[in-house]
Amino acid sequence: MQGVIRSFVSGGNVVKGSVLQHLRVINPAIQPSVFCSRSESTQPARMEESGFESTTISDVMKSKGKSADGSWLWCTTDDTVYDAVKSMTQHNVGALVVVKPGEQQALAGIITERDYLRKIIVQGRSSKSTKVGDIMTEENKLITVTPETKVLRAMQLMTDNRIRHIPVIKDKGMIGMVSIGDVVRAVVHEHREELQRLNAYIQGGY
């Protein structure tokens, strides 16, 4: 994955209860109270736009289908890390949205597989006795994007901050989440189409 990312980024320039026993879907109207000032809207863009740099996060979410349109897996701050990781494994995802117990519209943060590795495995802690709220990334520290954010900009944010999942915010509410895999696939797709257009031009197709 890092190899793919490096092929697009060089020197700052773009070449172009026990809950989780079952699937739970979060309310798309979830309202975070505060979002970090490091979000997409406040960081200076450092990436050059190219002809194919037109795909937005909204396009990425649409391509993922209904599962990404306001719905995602979640857990609560009181759930054990063990149950959270079990859910990630069962559903083949790398992160869960975290909400406050009994308040499905109150975003508390997110927990990722990286949180588990760094804060449980490396530190020798018990995943069965540690609560999600103890190791999650709190909502006021989240890096975020909007549906209008360009995919290359989102990829820059994710690589700069060394994160693999990023919440999508609209009107102060969280409407979804995309991963670095989603973003890279979108960039590769756009890059491939651009190369095809250039090839057609060279061969007289235009």
UniProtKB/Swiss-Prot annotation:
Keywords: CBS domain, Mitochondrion, Repeat, Transit peptide. Gene3D superfamilies: CBS-domain. This is CBS domain-containing protein CBSX3, mitochondrial. It is found in: Mitochondrion. GO terms for cellular component: cytosol; mitochondrion; plasma membrane. Its main location: mitochondrion. It comes from Arabidopsis thaliana (Mouse-ear cress). Residues 61-127, 136-194 form the CBS domain. InterPro entries: CBS_dom (IPR000644), CBS_dom_sf (IPR046342), CBSX3_CBS_dom (IPR044725), Diverse_CBS-Domain (IPR051257). GO terms for molecular function: cobalt ion binding. Residues 1-39 form a transit peptide. One of its GO terms (biological process) is cell redox homeostasis.
